[in-house]
């Protein structure tokens, strides 16, 4: 913020020293001049309206009047709340408007057979679910029979893949195996046994 000195000629900015040691001349300030740093920032009407809303003051209303009316409104709300508390303490709570209050049911409970009474509800549910699952499994069970020739072809293909992996390792082309390749190599003996079993089984 600029510091002004007053003289008989009016306001003026005093002489100041520059960093290199030279002096700036004193400058006279014209009447009504406002320095740039003191000029208020421009705000659009929309920004002013938002600021007034956040402050809780309606546009064009005096802040003092708004503060007084706010205090009065808060006082009335507190009085009303106290009055409602007193009334609610005296009277029983009435049902909310639009809510239908049903009288206690006079219908007799449904009859339960002696067998159902003896059996716990949890076990009844488990039995019914397990029975339904058994029926579903019976219906969904695959009826097809795997062709031994096709199975043998698939197994021989797997063995060829395993042998290719082993030959690449021996040749030094591949040093590290991924998870699938490791699984294939581990299953080599099992696949060979399956091939042997299928070859020894007489074909129909």
Swiss-Prot record:
Gene Ontology cellular component annotations, sorted alphabetically: cytoplasm; exon-exon junction complex
Ranges in coiled-coil conformation: 149-181
Chain intervals with Basic and acidic residues compositional bias: 68-90
Location of this chain's protein in the cell: Cytoplasm; Nucleus
Record field: compositional bias (Polar residues): 120-130
Gene Ontology BP terms: exon-exon junction complex disassembly; nuclear-transcribed mRNA catabolic process, nonsense-mediated decay
Region called Disordered, residue ranges: 1-27, 52-142
Pfam families reported in the protein's UniProt record: Mago-bind
Alphabetical UniProt keywords: Coiled coil, Cytoplasm, Nucleus
GO molecular function: exon-exon junction complex binding; RNA binding
Domain of life according to the entry: Eukaryota
Family: Belongs to the pym family.
PANTHER family referenced in this protein's UniProt entry, alphabetically: PARTNER OF Y14 AND MAGO (PTHR22959:SF0), PYM PROTEIN (PTHR22959)
Subunit structure, interactors included: Interacts (via N-terminus) with mago and tsu/Y14; the interaction is direct.
Physiological role: Regulator of the exon junction complex (EJC), a multiprotein complex that associates immediately upstream of the exon-exon junction on mRNAs and serves as a positional landmarks for the intron exon structure of genes and directs post-transcriptional processes in the cytoplasm such as mRNA export, nonsense-mediated mRNA decay (NMD) or translation.
Protein name: Partner of Y14 and mago
Organism of derivation: Drosophila simulans (Fruit fly)
Gene: Pym
């Amino acid at each position: 913020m600029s510091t002004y000195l007053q003289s008989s000629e009016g306001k003026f900015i005093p002489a100041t020293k520059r960093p290199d040691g030279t002096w700036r001349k004193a400058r006279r300030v014209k009447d009504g001049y406002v320095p740039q740093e003191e000029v208020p920032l421009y705000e659009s009407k929309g920004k002013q309206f938002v600021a007034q809303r956040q402050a809780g003051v309606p546009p064009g209303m005096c802040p003092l009047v708004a503060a007084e009316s706010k205090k009065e409104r808060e006082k009335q709300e507190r009085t009303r709340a106290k009055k409602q508390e007193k009334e609610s303490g005296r009277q029983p709570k009435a049902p909310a408007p639009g809510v239908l209050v049903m009288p206690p049911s006079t219908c007799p409970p449904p009859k339960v057979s002696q067998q159902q009474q003896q059996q716990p509800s949890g076990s009844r549910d488990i039995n019914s679910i397990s029975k339904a699952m058994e029926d579903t499994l019976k219906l969904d069970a695959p009826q097809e029979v795997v062709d031994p020739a096709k199975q043998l072809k698939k197994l021989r293909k797997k063995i060829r893949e395993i042998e290719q992996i082993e030959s690449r390792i021996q040749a030094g082309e591949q040093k590290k195996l991924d998870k699938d390749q490791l699984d294939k190599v581990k299953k080599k003996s099992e696949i060979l046994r399956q091939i042997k079993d299928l070859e020894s089984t007489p074909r129909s």
